[in-house]
UniProtKB/Swiss-Prot annotation:
It is found in: Cell inner membrane. One of its GO terms (cellular component) is plasma membrane. This is Ion-translocating oxidoreductase complex subunit C. HAMAP family: RsxC_RnfC. One of its GO terms (molecular function) is electron transfer activity. InterPro entries: 4Fe4S_Fe-S-bd (IPR017896), 4Fe4S_Fe_S_CS (IPR017900), Ion_transpt_RnfC/RsxC (IPR010208), Nuo51_FMN-bd (IPR011538), Nuo51_FMN-bd_sf (IPR037225), RnfC_N (IPR026902), Soluble_ligand-bd (IPR019554). Residues 359-389, 399-428 form the 4Fe-4S ferredoxin-type domain. Part of a membrane-bound complex that couples electron transfer with translocation of ions across the membrane. It comes from Pseudomonas aeruginosa (strain ATCC 15692 / DSM 22644 / CIP 104116 / JCM 14847 / LMG 12228 / 1C / PRS 101 / PAO1). Binds 2 [4Fe-4S] clusters per subunit. [4Fe-4S] cluster 1 binds at residues 369, 372, 375, 418. Keywords: 4Fe-4S, Cell inner membrane, Cell membrane, Electron transport, Iron, Iron-sulfur, Membrane, Metal-binding, Repeat, Translocase, Transport. Its EC number is 7.-.-.-.
Length: 774
């Protein structure tokens, strides 16, 4: 590089750094409490890994990074965690933020450190992990996690490392004192980054109003091939993009990063922290901060622990509250006013400016823009601040984006020269926040739309799958019906004429019609009489009068007469009707109906017995008697129909098939009887099932005789009895195995318990083996 380049715009501002650089770096006194916010960096806040009441050591990790773009936090001193929750936070919004509060014990006991003096023997990934574990973020003000910034994408070859020592904003002199007094640490940090990035060139940019810092770095440089470049004092030459343009003449793309053009920029304070983290093993728990302003008796640069309350630092510098106008965190151009002095010092705080009324006067009321163009002349990124102002007033977000609002670095140069005293930067910040919020809403809406479309597609696929399955089942059913039809057509015709059989069944139904109709009418009359009797008995419970007793007696006599008439009619029916079965068993419908009625009657009786309990009342007993009588009638009807039911015989059936069916029928009858005995059904039902079982046994014997198959030869085999000792040993072995498996599944199982369980299993196996060999 033969000559310096220039960036557009900029200002020449009074430095006001003489008072704060008059003293060397001071050490802040130990505070009683330290407030460590979880979000001191760009990206996701850290996750606490300590609990309230837990004792911590100095340098101990108290919060872990939550993701790639995040940074760990460490205890600034030894003590006890007394709170984890919301606390005032140094931010322009004034909103509280979660923090970890540590009460100091005053002992300053360090945790175990892991230094690495010979860092050149380490791999770049190992060095990056050390930087990440130390919780280092950019100390120049942005606070971007350093490890994430250094872990560039593989396609990005960094050829130039730019070291930012410009420190162009008035009052701030923290980097100046750091380079003067700790140049070796700064250069050591550069060496570590060179080990990681392997750049072709290292450029150190320092403004020419810091001759002591330039001399100190030059003296410590030695044989290193780094170039120290003196920059003209012009605000904001310390901006990342402006410094790169000054040193290299290249501009960073509007929507890009310096790494996109092969350049990486780091602040000198960050480099010193990298040196301490790698070489000394110390995490980032302190930083150098400038204490300046007319309200301080002793302006200075102080090395303070992260989390120190601001009011304690200002008191250490001799704060004169009578002269204090307000306190800014940062410089007069880019800083913001602190609403509460109890906020803590954070990693990105490079200056606390306690200004008096002369330095920080009350802002005058803003006047309308006169379109003078001064703001456009001083803008370091060649924007049109007056146009952005008008677009911000009208919430014209598209125009703001078209005019590159997000290229604004919020340096404050436009507001500084504005003759109308318009707070332009505040308008830009508000518009940026609105656009970010709108983008977040659009992103959420897009994500919701995608999820909805995915759900609709999933439902559509499920419906298509179900439709395909239904079509497949319908096709299979159609094929089965077609095959059945073909088999029926191919089957030989039976000897019985179906037309003649239908005529015979119709004639039988006509002959038995009169008796059936009379029996049906008698059943209805008997049922109505019982219902009337039951209703009268219920009324008798609440109206115990002679008239009611007489009515109940009359209804009981009528019900008994109806039951007797029904019983006589059923008894008068012929038991064996040669021509009736075909009519009564038309396609087995009557038999199925009788079975269903019998099952319903038995179920109703069982439910009533369960509901009435062990000691039913008089009315309940009467109901149970009626239900039992109904069950007996249904079973008698079913038995009569089953006697006349023809035995189904398959065409061409031989003796073996009949024997197989008889065996299956016998197994079914046995299962039904066993199930009924376990369910505790009525004795009459059990007798019926036993009779069916005996009939099935007789059918089986007849089938065996008919098939001509010889009876199997029975051979008695003596079964050796089981040794009780073997049974006992096998049981012990099973328990030992189960206990060991249960302990092995536990993640925190005791080693002694595991050893005891294994010993028990070995003993059980050995005992079983020894007994088997006896």
């Amino acid at each position: 590089m033969s000559a310096l380049h220039a960036f557009p715009g900029g200002l020449c501002l009074p430095a006001n750094k003489e008072r704060s650089t008059a003293l060397p770096i001071q050490q802040a006194p130990l505070a009683q409490r330290y407030i460590v916010p979880l979000g001191q960096h760009i990206g996701a806040p850290a996750r606490p890994c300590v609990e309230v009441g837990q004792a911590v050591l100095k340098g101990q990790t108290i919060a872990l990074p939550d993701g790639t773009v995040s940074a760990a936090l460490h205890a600034p001193t030894s003590g006890t965690v007394v709170a984890i929750g919301a606390h005032p936070y140094p931010h322009a919004s004034g909103l509280p933020a979660p923090a970890i509060v540590i009460a100091s014990d005053g002992l300053e006991r360090w945790t175990e450190l892991h230094p690495c003096p010979d860092f050149r023997a380490e791999s770049p990934l190992a060095l990056l992990e050390r930087i990440r574990a130390a919780g280092i973020g950019g100390l120049g003000g942005a606070g971007f996690p350093t490890a994430a910034k250094l872990a560039a994408r593989p396609a990005e070859k960094i050829h130039t490392l730019v070291v930012n020592g410009a420190e162009c904003e008035p009052y701030i002199s923290a980097d100046d004192l750091l380079m003067r007094e700790r140049a070796t640490q700064v250069l050591g940090g550069i060496d570590i980054l060179v080990q990681i990035l392997c750049p072709e060139e290292v450029l150190v940019g320092i403004e020419d109003d810091k001759p002591e810092a330039i001399a100190a770095l030059g003296a410590a440089l030695g044989e290193r091939p780094y170039r120290i470049v003196a920059l003209p004092t012009r605000y904001p030459s310390g901006g990342e993009r402006q410094l790169i343009q000054l040193l290299t003449g290249r501009e960073v793309p509007a929507d890009g990063l310096p790494a996109d053009i092969g350049i990486l920029c780091q602040n000198v304070g960050t480099l010193a922290a990298v040196h301490d983290a790698v070489v000394l093993g110390r995490p980032l728990i302190s930083r150098i901060t400038t204490l300046a302003g007319g309200a301080l008796e002793r302006p200075m640069n102080v090395e303070a622990l992260i989390g120190t309350p601001v009011h304690e630092l200002l008191a250490f510098a001799g704060l004169a509250e009578g002269r204090l106008e307000r306190v800014l965190m940062g410089g007069p151009m880019m800083g913001f006013a602190l609403p509460d002095l109890s906020v803590p010092l954070i990693k990105t705080c490079n200056c606390l400016l306690a200004g008096d009324a002369t330095e920080l006067p009350e802002p005058v009321p803003a006047m309308p823009c006169i379109r003078c163009g001064d703001c456009a002349q001083v803008c370091p990124v060649s924007l049109l601040p007056q146009q952005l102002h008008f677009f911000a007033l009208g919430d014209e977000h598209e125009q703001l984006l078209a005019h590159n609002l997000f290229d604004c670095i919020e340096c404050g140069a436009c507001a500084y020269v504005c003759p109308s005293s318009i707070p332009l930067v505040q308008y830009y910040r508000a518009s940026k926040a609105e656009i970010r919020e709108q983008r977040q809403k659009l992103l959420k809406a897009e994500q919701s739309r995608e999820r909805f479309e995915q759900r609709q597609a999933r439902l559509r696929r499920d419906e298509e799958r179900r439709a395909a399955e239904r079509a497949q089942r319908a096709e299979k059913a159609a094929l089965a019906r077609a095959a059945q039809a073909e088999r029926e057509e191919a089957a030989p015709a039976t000897a019985v004429d179906p037309v003649q059989a239908a005529i015979e069944r119709a004639r039988a139904r006509k002959q038995a019609g009169s008796g059936s109709e009379r029996l049906k009418r008698l059943k209805i009359e008997a049922s109505m009489a019982r219902v009337a009797l039951k209703k009268a008995e219920k009324q008798l419970l609440s109206h115990d009068t002679p008239e009611q007793h007489g009515l109940v007696a009359e209804l009981r006599a009528a019900a008994e007469a109806a039951d007797k008439a029904l019983a006589d009619a059923e008894a008068s029916l012929p038991r064996d009707l040669p021509s009736a079965p075909p009519a009564a068993l038309d396609d087995e419908a009557e038999l199925k109906k009788a079975k269903a009625q019998a099952a319903m009657a038995r179920a109703q009786l069982k439910r009533s017995e369960k509901a009435f309990g062990e000691a039913p009342g008089a009315e309940q007993r009467a109901t149970l008697d009626e239900l039992r009588a109904e069950v007996e009638r249904c079973e008698a009807t079913l038995a009569r129909l089953e006697r006349h039911a023809p035995k189904p015989a398959a065409p061409g059936d031989d003796g073996q098939a009949a024997l197989k069916r008889a065996k299956i029928a016998l197994v079914g009858k046995r299962a039904a009887l066993k199930k009924a005995e376990q369910a505790g059904v009525m004795d009459s039902e059990l007798e019926r099932l036993r009779g069916e079982l005996q009939a099935a046994e007789r059918d089986l014997h007849a089938a065996e005789d008919a098939c001509g198959k010889p009876a199997p030869e029975l051979v008695r085999i003596d079964k050796r009895p089981v040794d009780p000792r073997i049974r006992e040993l096998k049981t012990e072995l099973a328990y030992a195995r189960a206990a060991l498996k249960k302990l092995e599944r536990l993640a925190n199982a005791d080693a002694a318990a595991l050893a005891a369980a294994r010993a028990r299993l070995s003993a059980a196996e050995r005992a079983l083996t020894e007994h088997g060999t006896e």
